[in-house]
UniProtKB/Swiss-Prot annotation:
This is Fibronectin type III and SPRY domain-containing protein 1. InterPro entries: B30.2/SPRY, B30.2/SPRY_sf, Bbox_C, Butyrophylin_SPRY, ConA-like_dom_sf, COS_domain, E3_ligase_FN3/SPRY, FN3_dom. Residues 4-99 form a coiled coil. Residues 164-268 form the Fibronectin type-III domain. It comes from Bos taurus. Gene3D superfamilies: 1.20.5.170, 2.60.120.920, Immunoglobulins (2.60.40.10). GO terms for molecular function: microtubule binding. One of its GO terms (cellular component) is nucleus. Residues 105-162 form the COS domain. B30.2 box contains a microtubule-binding site. May be involved in microtubule organization and stabilization. It is found in: Cytoplasm, Cytoskeleton, Microtubule organizing center, Centrosome; Nucleus; Cytoplasm; Cleavage furrow.
């Protein structure tokens, strides 16, 4: 009995669900019926408006052409009537002269004949008939105003509803990825002069090959493109690839999307490894800010344990020119934080080959700031540039302003304005580490070295802050400088 009731309950539940689905579908059908009526009325109204526009245009053209015929007729009529009137007057004068001549010839009075003959001769000389052109001033031919609308009639007969545009074809051979920009080029398989604009959609992905149906990243949309190419600028390549697709639109409808394509967007992506940072550095994703109170509690405990009453001196303090005596002879074996005067934080991604580029903007009021690379073995007490395991550019605004390149506890003063944005270019296999003005791409300094271990991006700051920008490609201008040998001419072998 209970089993039957349970089975009946399941049937009731199934029926209820099905009824709800049917009701929802009925509502959808009713809504579609309303939409059909509304959309039909709209397209009918649009059609009538278009034809009315054609009628108005044809009527306007007709009136203009009729006016041209009337004006031409009036002009010719005027000329011909004037010429006709002149000829009529000349004929009347000539007939009068002829009659006078005949009468004179028949006259019997020979005494007056010479005088009369002379007058007739003078009258003939001055007669309008002999000064009149007997050629019509205008033609009666109106063929230049004839029309033949056979071609236009065929065009009108071909009027129909707008066709759905074909799907564009993306041309990968003409498309380009460079300088954190993507230029996408496409073409239409067939000529279509009804296309009004194109719509481009793109999204980021970490998957190579054809785009997948389901992606975590949404499609980004760019509308109103009038040409068959478009350039996306200022991109951050924080994923390995990008998917693209394009569709064409006319006034009424859009066509199908093109076959999606995937372009590789190679760039160096990393995050700051907060587990390595000095306790006085507050790390937030790619931003770092000096926090004077960050390690206060730990410092107090350390002083109580060691029985020492002094605190650590600032980085690069004249009183602390040598590494801390607490520095361990061996490199860091785990993920220990930097400590003492090494106000350092590392990136979380190793560089073991290829070319990579990133930029960092630091607060100009920072008392000290450094950027470069380091081996993973850099000791937790070691400062950037003061051992053979790190290379950096260092800005010091404390007591005395300096801008130096540092490696293996050696420094070279740089004769260049200190930019607020520094670009770092690392060519691992070539053993080149170059620093640039991030805004102008002016080369500041290049280290030449033989890297024996994978590198990590490294940063240091004291009483200041900075922000790192990753996902950048090696700029074309940087590649050109390196190819021209500018890097070699700017290097300092004493620091390598």
């Amino acid at each position: 009995m209970e089993d039957q009731k349970e089975a009946l309950r399941k049937i009731i539940t199934t029926l209820a669900v099905k009824n709800e689905e049917i009701q929802s579908f009925i509502y959808s059908l009713k809504q579609m019926l309303l939409n059909v009526e509304a959309n039909s009325a709209k397209v009918q109204e649009d059609l009538e408006a278009e034809f009315q526009s054609l009628f108005s245009l044809l009527e306007e053209l007709k009136e203009g052409m009729l006016m041209k015929i009337k004006q031409d007729r009036a002009s010719r009529t005027y000329e011909l009537q004037n010429q006709l009137a002149a000829c009529t007057r000349a004929l009347e004068s000539s007939e009068e002269l002829l009659e006078t001549a005949n009468q004179t010839l028949l006259a019997t009075d020979s005494k007056d004949f010479p005088q009369a003959a002379k007058q007739i001769k003078d009258g003939v000389t001055m007669a309008p008939a002999f000064r009149l052109s007997l050629k019509a001033k205008v033609s009666d031919n109106m063929s230049h105003l004839m029309v033949d609308f056979a071609q236009e009639r065929r065009m009108l007969q071909a009027l129909t509803f707008l066709p759905v545009p074909s799907a564009p074809v993306i041309d990968l051979t003409e498309s380009l990825v460079a300088d954190n920009c993507v230029t996408l080029v496409w073409r239409m398989p067939d000529e279509d002069n009804k296309i009004d604009h194109f719509v481009l959609e793109y999204r980021r992905t970490n998957f190579e090959g054809p785009p997948r149906l389901k992606e975590d990243q949404p499609w980004m949309v760019i509308e109103g493109i009038r040409q068959t190419e478009y350039t996306l600028t200022g991109l951050k390549f924080d994923m390995k690839y990008m998917n693209f697709r394009v569709k064409a639109c006319n006034k009424a409808v859009s066509g199908e999307f093109s076959e999606p394509v995937t372009l590789e967007t190679p760039a160096f992506m990393f995050r700051l490894d907060a587990s390595t940072s000095h306790q006085n550095l507050r790390v937030d994703d790619l931003s770092v800010e000096w926090d004077a109170m960050g390690g206060k509690v730990q410092d107090i405990k350390a002083r109580e344990k060691d029985g020492k009453g002094r605190t650590a001196s600032p980085v690069n303090s004249p009183a602390r020119g040598t590494p801390s005596p607490k520095r361990m002879p061996s490199g860091r074996g785990g993920r220990d934080r930097f400590t003492a005067e090494s106000y350092t934080v590392l990136g979380d991604t190793l560089i073991d080959g290829g070319e990579h580029y990133w930029e960092v903007r630091y607060e100009p009021d920072s008392k000290a700031f450094g950027v470069g690379v380091a081996y993973r073995s850099l000791g937790r007490f070691e400062q950037l540039g003061k051992t053979a395991a790190s290379w950096c550019l260092h800005v010091n605004n404390w007591l005395q302003v300096s801008f130096t390149a540092k490696h293996a506890n050696k420094a070279k003063m740089l004769d260049a304005p200190v930019p607020d944005c520094l670009g770092v270019h690392c060519d691992f296999h070539q053993g080149l580490l170059s620093f640039y003005n991030g805004r102008t791409k002016q080369l500041l300094h290049t280290f030449k070295a033989k890297f024996t271990q994978p590198l990590l991006p490294a940063f240091t700051v004291w009483c200041g802050s900075f922000h790192v920008t990753t996902g950048l490609q090696v700029p074309s201008s940087v590649r050109c400088l390196q190819k021209r040998g500018s890097a070699t001419s700017s290097s300092n072998t004493s620091l390598t």
